[in-house]
Amino acid sequence: MDGRGGSNEAPIAPRSSSLTASHRTMMNEESITNLFDREAIRDCLHRYCRGIDRADEAALRSCYWPDARDNHGSYSGSAAGFIQHALNVFKTKPRNIHQLTNIIIEFLGATEAAVESYFTALQRGHDATGEIKQVLLCGRYCDLFQKREGEWRIVERTVVYDWVEKQRPPKSSEAERFGPRQPIGAPHPNDPVYELSKRRVAAKNHPKDLIGSGEEEP
């Protein structure tokens, strides 16, 4: 103590602001990477739904790594084999609708994630005898995702079934049921959604054809 009652101890130096800022930057970068990774995984899952519903081979293949495995109901084997099996079925124009909810992503490291997503699937089409069947399926996709060269895809999938309900298909034709509600969904490449990408390509290649030349009318 000095004569004025003060302390002779040296004041505590403030923390280095540069270290604090560096730490914050690192945390922000990790958070942003985490968000990007989560969104990439969700996008892959949603792309799978389009691929299976539209029988879009390119979309389906973009969801799995080449060495991926798929345990999918009665099918168990390579993902490539499942894709071919699905295309053989769904290219025959059945009604097929997949929806996803409750997507839970648990990272096992920087390049692996365990992902559970709930699905609801309504499928309607001909069986092996030619009879029309309709079934409502509910369950979960239990997926192991891997990130390779910056891209997330499925390396292992197990489909868990929680609900199966066979339904009586309507007797009326699609033309009668849909009536004026047009257009209706179709397999790749005939579904209207693919026109959107065509227009985007056209806009890049020939922007003036879509937005005008910019010249005043005479």
From Swiss-Prot:
Residues 1-24, 169-218 are annotated as: Disordered. CDD domains: NTF2_like. Residues 15-24 have a biased composition (Polar residues). Residues 169-179 have a biased composition (Basic and acidic residues). This is Uncharacterized protein y4vH. It comes from Sinorhizobium fredii (strain NBRC 101917 / NGR234). Keywords: Plasmid. InterPro entries: NTF2-like_dom_sf (IPR032710), SnoaL-like (IPR037401). The keyword Signal does not apply. It comes from the Bacteria. Coiled coil: none annotated.
